């Protein structure tokens, strides 16, 4: 990686880290695990930076994070460890109730199967289209739609007091 590439990489990392860390947190449900996931994905992305700089480096990094997390879930399942993370970080009361809804949504996301959780994160937190999600996950648009439908149905069961917006393609 030459000096020009290093400068572009540093600029990319500085500008996109907050958004990508949010995705990592939503995938893992844990701040420390999110940091590890992001750093691991970034380490795998840097050697390919020269070829990515003109394409979609953020999309590539997001896909690497997703695949790394799926590998972790699979290893966890093989060991038959079931570990749900505990307490959310302490927050001040939000008079509008927005914080409570966000915390409830984070907790509910942890109860979704990994594939459904990932689709929800990419569709609604990252605001990707169904086509973009399908490309990132290496599946069909129909699969994205069915996972989204099942995930939203489950979230409605888990959060009966939270009004979820209608899901549209």
Language-model segments: residues:
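DNA-recognition helix of helix-turn-helix
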Residues: 137-161
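Residues within helix-turn-helix
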Residues: 32, 131, 142
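Structural recognition of an alpha-helix C-terminal capping motif at a helix-to-coil junction
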Residues: 36-43, 47, 55-67, 146
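Residue-level preference for hydrophobic side chains embedded in well-ordered alpha helices
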Residues: 12, 16, 20, 41, ...
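Short, charged helix-capping/linker segments at alpha-helix termini
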Residues: 1-11, 21-40, 48-55
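A short pre-motif secondary-structure segment
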Residues: 119-123
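Short amphipathic alpha-helical boundary/capping segments
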Residues: 9-11, 104-113
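Arg/Lys-rich amphipathic alpha helix in sigma70-family domain 2
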Residues: 63-84, 97-98
